[in-house]
């Protein structure tokens, strides 16, 4: 018989590595876009676990898929394949440019696989001197040593000793800088089709087109990090589908599993041939439980009414934020696409995004930040109009306590 451990926020400080600073409250259950803490206080969720809970909490199709698979088969490793993994891979090739899929456990792992594939392909086809990876300042691609180096934020990558080499960071949306630097040594360009952690910054159509054209000119691969933008978040299943260009490699995770950990790298048959047996792998990648849940998520999100509903909900958010801004004048603009939105604070409110987050939490609303100057919203793709209106009313009250 085990002794029940009393779980309070203070236990975090006793037993957890202090690389996080979680809120004081501890959620214990959720339904739709609402969660409840240990004291049964209710919160509206505009954070979605950082763009993960695309169908909200405990959506029936996800619960049913997990329960059904949980009674069949949990794990095999890639010594064998499994039905959920193959069905999901087939589905992902049907809804994207991809012909081949590699499964991982997270966005960082999917990006690691993407970068390794790009380097491997360049070495095999063009020789070892073609190894430069270009990424963009304020980008974010994960926390592994390779991906955090490729991400363009020194605050995350400094302090761990020598970094992987031949990585160059250029300004996002700067065509001239990219033209001036890119060469036949460039192996790949890695970019987010909408910068998330960097402040919810969309690419200009001209920049996106120029990146694709320059990659073609220099025989470099274009890698799209769609960990945050993918799986319906922008109103397209993948954000590239709204930009008029197609990457060579794409990474996806976060909302792919709707809250169950899974990541994937998508690419073409031609490129995939360069990751032969033994060149890369993952013990848990393609796990039957994860793939069964993700298959249910993809089937739900790809419904036309769900994707169309994302843009309808975006309009509700923008209208509500505009109304709040008319009262308090704290936002300079609302950026983003679909349900990946960032309210940029104006000059008087610079550095106070976390203040808004904390104040919102006290009013029963969960939001995010994207840097010190942007309040970020990444709710469920199926959040109801009532939940949006309730949440915006709570945000209004929260801001009123700060002015």
Swiss-Prot record:
Binding-site residues for pyridoxal 5'-phosphate, renumbered to this chain: 107-108, 140, 225-228, 283
Ranges annotated as spanning the membrane: none
Gene Ontology MF: a single term: identical protein binding
UniProt xrefs under InterPro entries: Ac/SucOrn_transaminase_bac (IPR017652), AcOrn/SuccOrn_fam (IPR004636), Aminotrans_3 (IPR005814), Aminotrans_3_PPA_site (IPR049704), Class-III_PLP-dep_AT (IPR050103), PyrdxlP-dep_Trfase (IPR015424), PyrdxlP-dep_Trfase_major (IPR015421), PyrdxlP-dep_Trfase_small (IPR015422)
Highest taxon of the lineage: Bacteria
GO cellular component term of the entry, any: cytoplasm
Residues bound to N(2)-acetyl-L-ornithine: 143, 282
Main location group: cytoplasm
Subunit structure: Homodimer.
Additional free-text comment from the UniProt record: May also have succinyldiaminopimelate aminotransferase activity, thus carrying out the corresponding step in lysine biosynthesis.
Family statement: Belongs to the class-III pyridoxal-phosphate-dependent aminotransferase family. ArgD subfamily.
Protein's name according to its UniProt entry: Acetylornithine aminotransferase
Species, as recorded: Vibrio parahaemolyticus serotype O3:K6 (strain RIMD 2210633)
High-level lineage: Bacteria, Pseudomonadati, Pseudomonadota, Gammaproteobacteria, Vibrionales
Name of the gene: argD
